[in-house]
Design a protein with these regions (language model features):
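Fe(II)/2-oxoglutarate
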Residues: 1-36
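Non-heme Fe(II)/2-oxoglutarate
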Residues: 8, 178, 182, 229-233
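Short amphipathic
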Residues: 40-46, 209
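Signature of the catalytic double-stranded beta-helix
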Residues: 46-47, 53-63, 84-138
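A short, aromatic/hydrophobic, helix- or strand-capping loop or linear motif
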Residues: 65-74, 136-139
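Catalytic core of non-heme Fe(II) oxygenases with the double-stranded beta-helix
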Residues: 106-112, 121-215
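Short beta-strand His + acidic residue motifs that chelate non-heme Fe in jelly-roll/DSBH
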Residues: 153, 224-231
Length: 233
């Protein structure tokens, strides 16, 4: 039986040893990176043999996934026809993906075990500076977003302050995670640059180097981001 402690790269990430200097240094480095840029990437967090298992388990469930096809603005809000037609809040983005909800996952699936591993949530709480709790929603607590040929996630902001994502498989091409860091401020939105990006400008766009097995901590509430169209199955 697979134990959660055997899922991650423990030589590099001894998350179950919080009293060690290695753990404390790792947490501090991740915290510093996240505070500076809104991004922290734990490279090679899960190694290939476990990724292969995660892919197999996901493939066995994808036929039951929820298909999502949406035309939305960056905030996922209803259209406001009191605004000019070319206002960024009225500009639409297309998103197409399949999502596997938490309640369809087997309790012994590697992703499920990792999500419920206490040392992981303790470490992430230390990095983010506040206590994290697992979501009680039986469907949305943990989801797997799957994209095939032509699917993508259009420009948007997240509803949550922070998103934690593990990439388990690379597409043949495309599928780039792109962002404009801190485009949105606590009290203001830069509609001028937002409008330019939605019209096709790549000024300020950063492509994150996220590989299969990497764990990404991302402040998606303030940073505009997207996943470019996928090529391959």
């Amino acid at each position: 039986m697979l134990g959660a402690e055997n899922i991650i790269n423990k030589e590099k990430y001894p998350l179950d040893q919080p009293k060690t200097d290695v753990w404390k240094t790792l947490a501090e480095n991740c915290k510093s990176a996240f505070q500076q840029s809104g991004v922290a990437i734990l490279k090679n967090f899960v190694q290939q043999p476990i990724l292969d298992r995660m892919i197999t388990e996901t493939d066995s469930t994808i036929h039951r996934s929820h298909f999502c096809k949406d035309n939305h603005n960056v905030f996922f809000e209803e259209d406001d026809n009191t605004l000019p037609a070319d206002h960024p809040l009225r500009m639409r983005e297309d998103t197409s993906l399949n999502s596997i909800p938490h309640d369809l996952m087997n309790s012994q699936d590697a992703l499920h075990l990792l999500y419920n591993w206490d040392p992981l949530i303790r470490f992430l709480s230390e990095v983010l500076g506040y206590k994290l709790f697992r979501m009680a929603d039986p469907m949305a607590a943990l989801t797997v977003n799957c994209m095939g040929a032509g699917q993508n996630h259009g420009w948007h902001y997240d509803e949550s302050q922070v998103t934690i994502t593990l990439l388990i498989q690379r597409p043949d091409d495309g599928g780039l995670f792109q962002t404009i860091p801190d485009l949105r401020k606590k009290d203001t939105d830069d509609y001028s640059q937002l409008g330019s990006v939605l019209k096709g400008s790549d000024v300020g766009v950063v492509t994150l180097n996220v590989e299969p097995g990497d764990l990404l901590l991302f402040a998606g509430f303030y940073s505009l981001h997207r996943v470019t169209p996928i090529k391959g199955d």
